[in-house]
Design a protein with these regions (language model features):
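An amphipathic alpha-helix adjacent to DNA-recognition modules
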Residues: 10-15, 27, 49-72, 76
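Short amphipathic alpha-helical elements of helix-turn-helix/winged-helix folds
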Residues: 16-20, 93
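Hydrophobic alpha-helical connector segments
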Residues: 58, 72-105
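Hydrophobic/aromatic-rich alpha-helical bundle segments in the mid-to-C-terminal region
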Residues: 118-123, 127, 132-185
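Short loop-to-helix capping motifs
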Residues: 114-115
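Helix-turn-helix
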Residues: 12, 20-54
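N-terminal intrinsically disordered/low-complexity leader segments
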Residues: 1-7, 185
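Short alpha-helical scaffolding segments that buttress acidic/His motifs in well-ordered protein cores
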Residues: 90-94, 105-109, 146-153
Length: 185
């Protein structure tokens, strides 16, 4: 099996696992269910992930990497002044790919309910990002409000609580972006 074909299969498996968690809940995440949803035999799934824990580790690692990499990419591609770049990228990444966010949230939920120690990598990456946000030239209080608002929005999206219509969500995002400009250090 070629590397790209192997990587494609892994993506299919991870997407299937995330879909099961999102649609049916953590308790329904079994190797059999993932294999079926991914269109593979259980042996085919086991070739890539030798156990349910290996699959969960793969989910957390893959989606954590993708999420934080998307933030870094936005910062790298930003041609404006350095003030607020990390905070702006955090806002943009958090709302630009809701499909990625849903998959990351599925991975984090599975880890939280099956083996919370698997969240350590995510926590480390989040702490690194938090350091960058707090040293971004934006008032630390505004950064904290922005971060907690995004985390709250993410929580709301994960659990389907108080969904915002498109207009309100866009106004919310605009308000967060305006807070970057307010009281810059």
């Amino acid at each position: 099996m070629s590397i790209s074909n192997s990587e494609d299969k892994k993506k299919i498996i991870l997407n299937a696992a995330a879909d099961i968690v999102k649609e049916e809940g953590v308790a329904k995440l079994t190797l059999e269910a993932v294999a079926k949803k991914a269109g593979l035999s259980k042996g085919g799934l086991l070739y890539h992930y030798s156990s349910k824990e290996a699959l969960i580790i793969g989910m957390v690692q893959d989606w954590t990497y993708r999420y934080f990499k998307s933030i870094e990419t936005i910062v790298e591609n930003n041609t404006k002044s350095g003030v607020g770049n990390w905070t702006s990228a955090y806002i943009k990444a958090s709302f630009s790919d809701l499909n990625l966010d849903k998959r990351l949230s599925s991975a984090l939920l599975v880890a939280m309910f099956t083996n919370p120690s698997l969240l350590e990598e995510y926590k480390k990456e989040y702490d690194i990002l938090l350091g960058k946000l707090m040293n971004d030239g934006v008032d630390p209080i505004n950064v904290t409000i922005i971060r907690l608002a995004i985390d709250g929005m993410w929580f709301s999206e994960i659990f389907g609580l108080g969904s915002l219509d498109t207009n309100l969500k866009n106004n919310f995002i605009n308000k967060l972006n305006n807070m970057i400009k307010e009281h810059s250090c």
